[in-house]
UniProtKB/Swiss-Prot annotation:
Modifications the protein undergoes after translation, according to the UniProt entry: Phosphorylated.
Zinc fingers (unnamed) by residue: 138-150
Molecular-function GO terms, alphabetical: zinc ion binding
Location relative to the cell: Virion tegument; Host nucleus matrix
Chief place of localization: virion
Official protein name in the record: Virion protein US10 homolog
Length: 236
């Protein structure tokens, strides 16, 4: 792991003082904020999981090479994406096939990003903007492996949120009140565990009849065991 990050890879700068070397500013990275993945800090690099260390180093090196091409007015290196793609597919194949002894909250997202990258195919990329975005996704996949310790989340927050809404089809980030929603469900299940399945059945019944809003009950009847629905009754 240390050997993968302790020196410069193909001209890719490595900051050693805890500061990123111009990521996304046009110094070190490509113009117009492209190829922010061409730089990294030593502290961040060594904090990545060992399983992604070599791949992350290649992403950084390829990004630096592409950033140099961009600054010189050349197109993306023809072998840049095919090289990264082959290495990623091999690594992601092992990751997807390995059992997960302990569930990690980032695993579903990591698998979604991985499937998206695999589906892109190995054909060379024609534009720097597209290659830069793919390098960012590859780096994001790596950093999901240390999601709670990553020191570079700002590199992904804006770009990856936009990508998720338009490319992965996952939809928007869960609303801020999602925790309150689940807390209410847990409280209901804890208070009346034997009735909880019937509450769920009632909700399914209402949705099947076209109701999209919650059924509002008078406060005096909220503990009743029967809910009247358009002239019918659902007995709990």
């Amino acid at each position: 792991m240390d050997g993968a990050y302790g020196h410069v890879h193909n001209g890719s700068p490595m900051a050693v003082d805890g500061e990123e070397s111009g990521a996304g500013t046009g110094t070190g990275a490509g113009a117009d904020g492209l190829y922010p993945t061409s730089t990294d800090t030593a502290a961040h690099a060594v904090s990545l999981p060992r399983s992604v260390g070599d791949f992350a180093a290649v992403v950084r090196a390829v990004s630096a090479e592409a950033a140099d091409a961009l600054r010189s007015g050349a197109g993306p290196p023809a072998e840049a994406w095919p090289r990264v793609y082959r290495m990623f597919c091999d690594m992601f194949g092992r990751y997807a096939a390995s059992p997960m002894p302990v569930f990690h909250s980032a695993d579903p997202l990591r698998r979604a990003v991985g499937r998206y990258l695999v589906d892109l195919g190995a054909a060379p990329v024609e534009t720097h903007a597209e290659l830069s975005g793919r390098m960012l996704f590859c780096a994001y996949w790596c950093c999901l492996g240390h999601a709670f310790a990553c020191s570079r989340p700002q590199m992904y927050e804006r770009a990856c949120a936009r990508f998720f809404e338009t490319r992965l089809g996952i939809g928007e980030t869960p609303p801020a009140d999602a925790e309150r929603y689940w807390a209410a469900l847990l409280n209901m299940a804890g208070a009346e565990p034997e009735l909880f399945p019937r509450h769920a059945a009632a909700a399914a019944y209402l949705r099947a009849r076209g109701r999209k809003l919650p059924l509002q009950l008078p406060s005096a009847h909220r503990t009743a065991k029967t809910v009247a629905v358009t002239g019918q009754s659902i007995n709990f």
